[in-house]
Curated annotation (Swiss-Prot):
HAMAP family (alphabetical): UbiB
Domain Protein kinase as annotated: residue spans: 121-504
Protein name (record): Probable protein kinase UbiB
Species the sequence originates in: Xylella fastidiosa (strain Temecula1 / ATCC 700964)
Keyword Transmembrane in record: yes
Its membrane topology: Multi-pass membrane protein
């Protein structure tokens, strides 16, 4: 019953924001139309809004889980139209905070001790509040300033109920929407469920932060706050407290004397290093999660501070290689290579003609190369390439789509800091250097050395495994020979049967012809009372039937 009321409310909100137009021509749209008399009249202000804005406003009204749904949907640019995707990016994950005393209770249950014994001071008024968690300031007994991230009470059940409802809606859309095969609603909901499940485990988020910190511990480019593991559990995450300037606060950055040009180039370099050197990249890199160190000593060599580690990305080695090669092919305007790489990577079926893909890649990339370098976006090029490739049954792993969205965010942050940022000039040497190092003989020897214990462990078994493999090959060949003989015998049997069938058909036909000729008494030679042609047909027909019977 609760789910029914929730579904009714969703339908009511959809109608209020005229989202029924997104379902035109479907069974759902017809049912929604029946409910229109029970919904207040739509204001002229809403009618004048774009469909993307109407969807964004509706999701905000439906609550925090649907806001999170919209945010995740905005990352799937391969599935949603550009106008809707651009609007969903602007969704703000801000909700009313829950009681500070409730947060204290959750912390005490998770850590197994009182707040007073865990912290010297704990501020019950949150610093920030979002759909899944909220953050409180605190001080440890050793006087270190920290922030404590606490999951909302009963959030798991709320998410479970809303996910179940979304699954039902996705199934309905899949069966009624004419473009369901392109939208793939159940795939979207499954991805949302996976992402939310990861964000509900704060210990996992702490592990992500710890790994990223280890990669960049000695770097002047980014700083990752330390995880306080003694004060971290599945529902509570305690991190070193950071102070900085949001990367989109241009006025404050300028007032602090930060070199924005150096900062923007550094952001691009850091991203490509995370993807191709570390294979562990921050996948929620919007300006709210990227701050700038406000230390006056770092004005000329600014440093990023990274926050929120719930969504991290990793690529398979295969996708890493093909993505890097794609970037290099774009840099060199090698459209043939771009097409070949899409097929070799398995993103596009092998039956698609390379020439068609090459022409499609050229039509996407060439218009970008006519622009000033400061206006070229590598993320946009990749997004357009993938969008065009959908016509050729493009299949991408979710992590690649996540990377595409992250690259778009990183370029956006970089262009905010420096509108004249030349992403190609910054990215190309970094990518070339990383690829040279990654595929160098030294790196190959390093990887070999890393796997040497495994190789040495299995080395004694190698002769036995080779012998077993050779025996299998010999046995397989013998078995194949037997199968081949059986197939040949079967083929000969079928050929004989085919000849007998033909003889029987011919014989029967000739006997019928003989009987017809005998009955018609045609002009010509007769042997007694039998026409000669009838006699010849009968004899040949009888021989053919006897041949078919004798062979059987």
């Amino acid at each position: 019953m609760k789910a029914l009321f929730r579904a009714c409310r969703i339908g009511k909100v959809m109608l209020r924001y005229r989202l029924d137009t997104l379902l035109d021509g479907t069974a759902v749209e017809r049912w929604l139309r029946l409910a229109k008399p029970f919904v207040p009249r739509i204001s002229a202000e809403i009618v004048e809004q774009s469909r993307g804005r109407r969807l964004r406003l509706a999701l905000q009204e439906l609550g925090p889980i649907f806001v999170k749904f919209g945010q995740i949907l905005s990352t799937r640019r391969d599935l949603v139209p550009q106008d809707i995707g651009d609007e969903l990016v602007m969704l703000q994950d801000r909700v009313e905070p829950f009681e500070g005393q409730t947060a204290r209770s959750i912390i005490e249950t998770a850590l197994g001790k009182s707040v007073e014994s865990a912290f010297a001071h704990f501020d019950t008024v949150p610093l920030a509040s979002a759909s899944i968690s909220q953050v409180h300031a605190a001080t440890l007994h050793d006087r270190r300033a920290v922030v404590v991230k606490v999951l909302r009470p009963d959030i798991e059940h709320q998410i479970s109920d809303d996910i179940a409802l979304l699954k039902s809606l996705a199934t309905l859309v899949e069966h009624t929407h004419p473009n369901a095969d392109k939208i793939r609603p159940r795939e979207i909901v499954a991805e949302i469920e996976t992402t939310l499940a990861a964000e509900l485990d704060l210990q996992r988020e702490g592990a992500n932060a710890s790994v990223l910190r280890r990669f960049w511990e000695a770097s002047d480019d980014i700083y990752v706050p330390e995880v306080i593991w003694s004060h971290t559990a599945e529902r509570v995450l305690t991190l070193e407290r950071m102070y900085g300037i949001p990367s989109d606060d241009i006025a404050l950055l300028d007032a602090s004397g930060i070199d924005r040009k150096a900062l923007s180039s550094k952001g691009i370099r850091v991203f490509y290093t995370q993807v191709f050197r570390d294979n562990f990249f921050h996948a929620d890199a919007h300006s709210g999660n990227i701050w700038v160190d406000s230390d006056p000593a770092r004005k000329s060599n600014p440093r990023f501070i990274v926050l929120d580690f719930g969504i991290m990305g990793q690529l398979s080695q295969k996708d890493q290689y093909y993505l890097a090669e794609n970037f290099m092919a774009i840099f060199h305007k090698d459209y043939r290579r771009i097409a070949e790489l899409h097929v070799e990577a398995g993103w596009i079926p092998p039956h698609v003609r390379i020439e068609e893909l090459e022409a499609a890649a050229r039509s996407v990339c060439e218009p970008y190369f006519t622009r000033p370098l400061s206006q070229i976006s590598l993320a946009e090029v990749m997004m357009k390439l993938f969008h065009v490739a959908r016509r050729y049954q493009l299949t991408l792993q979710p992590q690649l789509i996540l990377l595409q969205k992250t690259l778009l965010n990183i370029e956006g942050v970089g262009r905010q800091l420096d509108p004249e940022l030349d992403i190609w000039v910054v990215a190309r040497p970094v990518l070339e250097r990383i690829l040279r190092a990654r595929y160098s003989p030294r790196h190959a020897l390093k990887e070999l050395n890393k796997r040497l214990p495994e190789i040495m462990t299995h080395a004694p078994d190698t002769p036995r495994l080779i012998h077993t493999w050779l025996v299998q090959q010999v046995e397989s060949r013998k078995q194949n020979d037997v199968y081949l003989q059986q197939i040949r015998a079967l083929a000969m049997t079928l050929q004989g049967l085919q000849r007998r069938v033909v003889n029987a058909i011919v014989g029967s036909g000739l006997l019928v012809a003989a009987a017809v000729l005998y009955g018609l008494h045609p002009d010509g030679l007769y042997l007694g009372t039998i026409p000669v042609w009838s006699l010849i047909s009968g004899c040949i027909g009888a021989l053919a039937l006897f041949s078919a019977w004798w062979r059987s």
